UniProtKB/Swiss-Prot annotation:
This is ESX-5 secretion system protein EccE5. It comes from the Bacteria. GO terms for cellular component: plasma membrane. It is a multi-pass membrane protein.
Length: 403
């Protein structure tokens, strides 16, 4: 992995035009100041020139992918906002919906006219014994290209699909999360030897839809919810059995997803910082991945599975459609008891001033605008990027002598 250069330039036409107009207004005001303000050396004029130069630098120069003014504004907004309210906004109770000829009951969450549904994916080991799958791969994976192909399904256009994976480190918590009581009873969680229990990964696909972009699709179906549920069921059926086990979640399961993605982060006890998010039992630090580095090797490295400082990792891959082509971006969040050592984040780009936004962007929450915008790359036709799901290593077999 390689982090992008710390400083850069944002030179879009819209930004340059806005900055030019602001500078022009500043110079006009400075040139029309009273003579008593100008003095012999035209002090007011040169002060105006200095302010214009400062505004230009702050608006054009970027730090870690964001302009200085945007970074400071975002940080001040997060710092002044109540984290509990900010993270809870949009986490409305979901409603179960089943299509007239549908098979599954799908939970739909609505907020400000936008809709969200969630698909859970895993390796299928916990399914009933009578359910057979003809998997085309040896290990359970989510093929990113397959998900991207389903951003548009006939007349339904999704705003985007987020692939969110949470990995809890080995130990008692991961043993509980692995949910195999026959293999690991409660009395055995604390009796593991030197080898740790398996790191537990849980993965969800979060589908987002803007009804205003799907007027024709909605007109031919029962309702808004039915339109998104149709796309959700179709994507789940495409993934299920081919490379992983997939099923849409019901309404009562969405609240559990909120809690799992927060990874024990308590919103009401959190304080946003410039470089991390401080909460009552540790730190949450978010980074974005350089687009050119979003590949299988990088996705294997970002977990930091061997780092004892990290208790949980949350990885988000975002797929959106831009100009008819799918684009991919990624960011990762680490939970630790202390501040994350710098050597663990080498090659990643810190989300400076946007730590709270990074947490909220990973939640299954409908939003009228993107909570987080990071650099992305085009997903090519031959891109074979896959995200493994399920456990990352076998349970420890060593135990105490008495056991």
């Amino acid at each position: 992995m390689k982090a992008q250069r710390r400083f850069g330039l944002a030179l879009s036409w819209a930004r340059l035009t806005t900055v030019f107009v602001i500078d022009l207004l500043i110079l006009i005001v400075a040139s029309h100041c009273p003579d008593s303000w100008q003095g012999e050396n035209r002090i007011a004029w040169w002060v105006g020139v200095g302010i214009a130069v400062l505004v230009t630098l702050l608006s054009v120069v970027t730090y870690r992918g964001i302009t200085v003014t945007s970074g400071i504004t975002a940080w001040l907004w997060d710092w002044s906002a109540d984290p509990g309210t900010a993270l809870g906004a949009g986490c409305t109770p979901a409603v179960d919906h089943q299509r007239r000829f549908g098979r599954d009951t799908v939970g739909v969450r609505e907020h400000h006219g936008r809709l969200v549904t969630v698909i859970t994916v895993d390796d299928g080991e916990g399914d009933a014994a009578g359910r057979h799958r003809h998997r085309t791969t040896q290990s359970a994976v989510v093929p990113v290209a397959t998900v991207a192909e389903n951003l548009r399904q006939f007349d339904v256009q999704l705003d985007g699909v987020d692939i969110v994976t949470v990995e809890v480190r080995g130990g008692a918590e991961a043993a509980r999360a692995s949910a195999s009581l026959d293999e690991w009873g409660p009395e055995e969680w604390g009796m593991v030897g030197e080898s740790p229990a398996a790191n537990r990964r849980r993965t969800w696909l979060i589908l987002r839809m803007n009804p205003q972009r799907n007027v024709a699709a909605i007109a031919s179906r029962d309702s808004l919810a039915s339109t998104l549920v149709t796309a959700t069921e179709r994507l789940a059926q495409v993934l299920d059995g081919q490379s992983c086990a997939a099923r849409p979640l019901a309404a009562d399961e969405l609240a559990e997803v909120d809690s799992a993605i927060l990874a024990e982060l308590e919103p009401t006890w959190s304080r946003p910082g410039w470089r991390h998010l401080k909460h009552f039992n540790g730190y949450a630090t978010s980074f974005w991945v350089t687009p050119a580095d979003i590949n299988a090797e990088t996705l294997d490295e970002v977990w930091l599975s061997d780092a004892p400082e990290v208790g949980a990792t949350v990885l988000t891959l975002r797929l959106v459609m831009r100009a008819g082509e799918p684009r991919l971006s990624a960011w990762v969040r680490y939970h630790s008891d202390e501040r994350l050592p710098k050597e663990l984040s080498v090659g990643l780009n810190r989300l400076t001033g946007r730590q709270l936004a990074a947490v909220r962007a990973s939640l299954p929450v409908p939003s009228t605008r993107a909570q987080l915008v990071v650099s992305s790359r085009e997903l090519l036709d031959h891109d074979e990027l896959e995200l493994p799901v399920g456990q990352t290593q076998e349970h420890a077999t060593s135990a105490t002598t008495g056991q």
